[in-house]
């Protein structure tokens, strides 16, 4: 299966989005609710239908930027959130994106890219995170699939990979995952020191 812009757009066009839970995940919701600085610049790569961005915007975070290959996913988001600034919706390649962000949210993007791209993902994250910026989100702690998304993995493989690029890496079992993902997710907090 070739993972291309056309494939992802087609999946959104056909509503073939089995990973989409239809709302923000509980671990991220609770994390966002404790954030105090509403002026931080946030990026959500591989944002899909972007329920996280919708929730952040409702909380008063106005510098939320979304990037996805699939224009249909961004269109879905814009339809639900017509007041969200169009200039902060980017249809493009995460690996070519430029900018600096205080917070980057990981929610099913890492598992959607081929495992061969994981090191490239971390190099790009390092470039996009401002000094003391954070990468926060969820990773599957489950084997899942090796030939198609969602590509899985285990904490034992993630830690050395993430630690190669970041010296502040925390990965803990998510205690508040939705039932279908219980005991299968890691909540990650990575700081760009």
Residue ranges and their predicted role:
Residues 108-112:
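Short catalytic micro-motifs in class I SAM-dependent methyltransferases
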């Amino acid at each position: 299966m070739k993972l291309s812009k056309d494939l992802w757009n087609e999946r959104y066009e056909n509503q073939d989005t089995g990973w989409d839970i239809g709302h923000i995940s509980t671990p991220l919701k609770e994390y966002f609710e404790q954030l105090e600085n509403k002026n931080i610049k946030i990026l959500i790569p591989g944002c899909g239908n972007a329920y996280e961005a919708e929730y952040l915007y409702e909380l008063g975070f106005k510098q939320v930027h979304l990037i996805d290959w699939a224009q249909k996913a961004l269109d879905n988001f814009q339809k639900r959130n017509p007041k969200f600034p169009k200039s902060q919706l980017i249809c493009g390649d995460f690996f070519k994106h430029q900018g600096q962000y205080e917070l980057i949210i990981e929610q099913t993007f890492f598992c959607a890219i081929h495992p061969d791209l994981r090191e490239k993902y971390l190099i790009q994250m390092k470039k996009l995170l401002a000094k003391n910026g954070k990468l926060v989100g969820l990773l599957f702690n489950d084997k899942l699939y090796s030939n198609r998304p969602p590509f899985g993995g285990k904490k034992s493989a993630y830690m050395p990979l993430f630690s190669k690029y970041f010296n502040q890496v925390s990965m803990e079992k998510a205690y508040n995952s939705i039932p279908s993902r219980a005991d299968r997710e890691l909540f990650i907090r990575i700081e760009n020191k």
